[in-house]
UniProtKB/Swiss-Prot annotation:
Pfam families tied to this protein: Ribosomal_S19 (PF00203)
InterPro entries documented for this protein: Ribosomal_uS19, Ribosomal_uS19_bac-type, Ribosomal_uS19_CS, Ribosomal_uS19_SF
Cellular compartments per GO CC: cytoplasm; small ribosomal subunit
The keyword Ribosomal protein appears for this protein: yes
Protein name as it appears in the record: Small ribosomal subunit protein uS19
Domain of life: Bacteria
Keywords of this entry: Ribonucleoprotein, Ribosomal protein, RNA-binding, rRNA-binding
GO terms under biological process: ribosomal small subunit assembly; translation
Task performed by this protein: Protein S19 forms a complex with S13 that binds strongly to the 16S ribosomal RNA.
C-alpha cells in the first residue's frame, strides 16, 4: 500500500541532517535507517546502509529517487540449492 501524498516521504531526522551537511563530501554517510525514502537531495551522495551485519555503500543516482534505502542493501545471501556433487564438475 502506498503512502498518502499529504503525509509526504519518510526520512529519519538524523539522516536528513547528515545529508544536508554532507553536500560536497566524498565520505559515505553511515546509517541504520533502511526505511528512509531516497529524496532528490541525496543524488550523488554515497550512503552506507546497514544490512544486519555490515554497512553496504550505495551511490545514489536519479533512478533511485522514491525507493527505500533498504532495497539496495541485500540482507540475505543465496548460496545455491543443494545438488548432486558428481554433476558439479
Amino acid at each position: 500500500m502506498a503512502r498518502s501524498l499529504k503525509k509526504g516521504p519518510f526520512v529519519d531526522h538524523h539522516l536528513a541532517k547528515k545529508v544536508e551537511s554532507a553536500a560536497g563530501s566524498k565520505k559515505p554517510i553511515k546509517t541504520w535507517s533502511r526505511r528512509s525514502m531516497i529524496l532528490p537531495e541525496m543524488v550523488g551522495i554515497t550512503i552506507a546502509v546497514h544490512n544486519g551485519k555490515n554497512h553496504i555503500p550505495v551511490l545514489v543516482n536519479e533512478n533511485m529517487v522514491g525507493h527505500k534505502l533498504g532495497e539496495f542493501a541485500v540482507t540475505r545471501t543465496f548460496k545455491g540449492h543443494g545438488g548432486d556433487k558428481k554433476s558439479s564438475r
